[in-house]
Amino acid sequence: MSAMNPDRPKAIPASLTRRDVLRNMGGLGLLTLTGGAGTLLGACTTAQSGSQVLAADPEIAALVDSVLGIDMHSHAAGASGRPQPAYDLAERIRVGRMTAVCLCHPGDAPVIKREPDNRIRTVRQPEPGELWRFTQRRLKWFDDLVTAQGLRRALQRGDLEAAHRDKAPAIVQTIEGCHFLEGSLERMGEVYRRGVRHLQLVHFFRSDMGDNQTEPADQGGLTSFGRDAIVECNRLGIVIDVAHATREFVAAAAQASKTPLILSHTSVAKGQPAAFSRRISPEHARLVASTGGVVGVWGSPSTFKSLSDYVDAVAAAVDVAGVEHVGFGTDNSGFGPTLAVWDDYRDFPVIVRLMRKRGFSPDDIRKIAGGNYLRVFNLSVKAT
């Protein structure tokens, strides 16, 4: 289930979702529902859907249309195999008037698990070749998805701008964790040929790329193999994502890469984060910014309880890294409800309106909501 969100209406009967109410109420000012969950009065006055924001505020609607909206980190459905999406991702991108989603599959999904304390840990070692075979299945899943939902793949410079111009929902195909390499850099060329243009180097499972934030750091940051992988990403034309990596890893990656770095999903702590935290320090954020890169703000339910909280976190990241170096990285699932505080792309106009209320200028919103990622994408991928 999605986390309860103060920017949305109060709970309503289980037979009717909050979003169903909002999308069916149209311009009505009052509605009363009775049942086991109690009574909902005046839902439209306490929260609006993205569609209602667009209809009610022409200025926000025009701004949304001018924004090339991109989520730098979202998940493909399911942990393994090729599950069917719970809903139409392309339609949600289209209704929210976004442009693209960096849609990933975690390369270590078969060997990790969320445990009762809510931490994700490695539960077993993979069999030789297992994670490569898993990735090959997921590449086929992406092929099927693009065909079934009519999505575009962003593969080269200009593709994201064209998707925005044509109002055609797009994905930047992403792998979260380079575990599929299993020591073979040649496989990077294979996933590139299959449409991958964004690679996150590490995830939860211990990687030969280097140290991650959620395991004891014992590899000195970035390994020589990790450095070679960065060079290969630069050669092929792949966006380099250092989410989940330690600060020492990121510092070495900044030296190794010829292109700016993305840190797709995190939040910036006020000081030094706790051990094994996925948050980053201000110095860590500024390190990414120093490459010309972008830090994506996630929607962690353990940290943020509303879309307003999320926008506040974006503002805090901007204060640290600068408006040219912050973006959206929701860490939601593109295909079903999650605990992420922003779990539905139809809410994009709500985010834009909240940013305006928070004091962001239209130009700043265009940068944060997608322009900054677009800059790094175009500097990283090939022209043709």
Which role does the model predict for each range below?
Residues 1-20:
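N-terminal secretory signal peptides
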Residues 15, 37-74:
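C-terminal segment of N-terminal export signals and the immediately downstream linker at the start
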Residues 73, 195, 240, 295, ...:
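Conserved, mostly hydrophobic/aromatic
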Residues 87-89, 183-193, 197, 215-262, ...:
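Histidine/acidic residue-rich metal-binding segments in metalloenzymes
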